[in-house]
């Protein structure tokens, strides 16, 4: 059964970038898999800085959730391919109102994120706060910028990501768990790793508590015990 305790989805990071991309390419029970991780940001517009809670996300994060921007756009496919090439940022509707004065002209504006030049490309819809409800996210940046914003992490191997997916039509939670477990075991075998005493036979699935109750159906946050070197 799907786990409903939000704590299950918030405890630690669970996937390396390499593991995430392999799951995304090989899954058949899920329509898509996206990844995110938390990051502390200082976002400054015209010299006025604001400390915000942010997320770094895969390029399909918003599209998989079916979220549409209130203004501007979300991340394009080419902004999710090459590290450090697309310094762009999306802000929450609340941040746009409180820090940017509800200025529709803010789209395309040069801002700074942790002192680095970025372009503001979009505003999330009112009420959208990310996929983990206890925390309100005010800014989203591409995973590909992680070396600039989290320089101690290696994009390929470190276990620094949380992942979620959307069930494909006709697929059940049980089928998704079985497939994800098999893909995880195969991933470990391909890398020549051994699990020691860790149990790889259970994939914990949880509801995405940050989404409205009527929008959660079909979405699964998942945790596994591997991950990374």
What is each of the regions a protein language model found here?
Residues 1-40, 159-164, 206:
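Membrane-proximal extracellular/periplasmic loop immediately following the first transmembrane helix
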Residues 79-81:
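Conserved, non-catalytic sequence blocks in retroelement Pol enzymes and Pol-derived host proteins
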């Amino acid at each position: 059964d799907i786990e409903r305790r939000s704590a299950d989805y918030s405890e630690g990071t669970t996937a390396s970038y390499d593991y995430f991309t392999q799951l995304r390419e090989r899954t058949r029970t899920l329509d898509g898999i996206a990844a995110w991780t938390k990051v502390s940001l200082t976002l400054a517009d015209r010299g006025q800085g604001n400390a915000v809670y942010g997320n770094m996300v895969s390029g399909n994060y918003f599209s998989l959730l079916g979220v549409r921007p209130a203004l501007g756009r979300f991340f394009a496919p080419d902004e999710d391919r090459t590290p450090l090439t697309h310094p762009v940022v999306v802000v929450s509707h609340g941040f746009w109102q409180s820090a940017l004065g509800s200025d529709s002209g803010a789209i395309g504006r040069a801002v700074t994120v942790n002192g680095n030049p970025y372009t503001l490309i979009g505003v999330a819809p009112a009420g959208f706060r990310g996929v983990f409800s206890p925390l309100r996210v005010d800014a989203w940046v591409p995973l590909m910028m992680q070396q600039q914003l989290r320089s101690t992490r290696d994009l390929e191997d470190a276990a620094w990501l949380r992942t979620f997916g959307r069930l494909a039509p006709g697929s059940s939670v049980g089928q998704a768990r079985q497939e994800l477990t098999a893909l995880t075991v195969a991933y470990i075998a391909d890398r020549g790793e051994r699990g020691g005493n860790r149990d790889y036979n259970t994939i914990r699935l949880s509801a995405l508590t940050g989404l409205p109750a009527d929008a959660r159906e079909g979405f699964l946050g998942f945790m596994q015990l591997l991950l990374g070197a």
